[in-house]
């Protein structure tokens, strides 16, 4: 799709969407995004130039269909996949990618940590993906020295970062906000550092007694990113791993640094989004979103959940989707899904499906709550189909049509029941939607009440209830 678009840009010193937007150029990617988001091209260009919207689109990922992440666009959902040393292989990860895209993932992150040829897995995923692909390069940096922190040097990090750019990775989680002076702030936490990338860098700093190399070499990383239009996803190494640790001094100290790094990247015209928690009580979610907007000049916020309770292993796609919906309502731009296997094991294909649907629900609920134009159209169309007992239309409009049809057909599988004016819940005689009260019926009732001297009925609009 993008081969012709990017051919003229390759070799230029800066090919980022932000760079072109700041020059007043509407790229083909911006025009494409404007169309699918139903936004003016000028607004997309202005938001990208401002840093409030990103279009993750590496020039080497030519089969990508561009999409936008930002408060002006629809709330997006990311799905994580990836092989571990103990489970999965390259073919299975590509299948997970296809399943994730099928069920609505807007971006996919390859979090492979070992057990396979990481470059082979990554290039296979990128080659098969029409959605942006993100990675966490510190995983491969550590794997490249066989897990020996003491052998890992600054150039190893930058070498892997550029390799990912060359392969077509659209955004990379860069844990540059974790500083050596932040580490003592972890004292008193119940769960310490729960970011894998953050943990690697914390170990590196503790061993070498030196500052985080991703921080000290941040400008060098910016120089790499702008040559490929790779986007920063600034990692939150000190995100809370439980309710107890939410919004603590460690988390907020790193967030302040992430704001500084956001502005540094923008000086290079490099796109940025900022990652966020994690595990956060419901009453602290709004504070966390607003604080990120304040510290990071409204760069798109990308949160993992957050989980609103810690007592439901096996159901954390639910505990986190609750928090994700609220975070999206308050302005979070992208939600990173959580599967039922979170904290328990590597998710399989069915776990990916369950997590994604939970998060598509959360993102859609957030869009409705934020009154995005057209956000509720599909809901209204499904409701009309439900009222008309148009079962096939209901399935078609569902986030997961296969599951909706499967559940309906468990008890009423025959085709004749696709025209039935009931389901197995109420049966043929007790469905309340069979009670068709028309406007004409109500007009007639009003006339009767008026003739009897009763007060005129006053209609109440649904949105004012």
UniProtKB/Swiss-Prot annotation:
State how the cofactor is bound.
Answer: Binds 1 [4Fe-4S] cluster per subunit. The cluster is coordinated with 3 cysteines and an exchangeable S-adenosyl-L-methionine.
The Gene Ontology terms for molecular function here are: 4 iron, 4 sulfur cluster binding; carbon-carbon lyase activity; zinc ion binding
Q: In which pathway does it act?
A: Cofactor biosynthesis; thiamine diphosphate biosynthesis
One annotated Gene Ontology cellular component of this protein: cytosol
Q: Which residues bind Zn(2+)?
A: 279, 343
Quote the record's binding site residues for [4Fe-4S] cluster: 423, 426, 431
- Positions annotated to bind substrate: 80, 109, 139, 175, 195-197, 236-239, 275, 302
* InterPro entries referenced in this protein's UniProt entry, alphabetically: ThiC, ThiC/Bza_core_dom, ThiC/BzaA/B
**Superkingdom to which the source organism belongs:** Bacteria
EC number(s) stated in the UniProt entry for this protein? 4.1.99.17
Q: Which Pfam families match?
A: ThiC_Rad_SAM
Task: Please give the cofactor(s) recorded in the UniProt entry for this protein.
Answer: [4Fe-4S] cluster
Gene Ontology BP annotations: thiamine biosynthetic process; thiamine diphosphate biosynthetic process
> Does this UniProt record's set of keywords contain Iron?
yes
Recorded catalytic activity of this chain's protein: 5-amino-1-(5-phospho-beta-D-ribosyl)imidazole + S-adenosyl-L-methionine = 4-amino-2-methyl-5-(phosphooxymethyl)pyrimidine + CO + 5'-deoxyadenosine + formate + L-methionine + 3 H(+)
Q: What class of enzyme is it?
A: lyase
Its signal peptide is: none
So what family is this one in?
Belongs to the ThiC family.
Q: HAMAP family attached here?
A: ThiC (MF_00089)
Protein name as catalogued: Phosphomethylpyrimidine synthase
Q: Which organism is this entry from? A: Synechococcus sp. (strain CC9311)
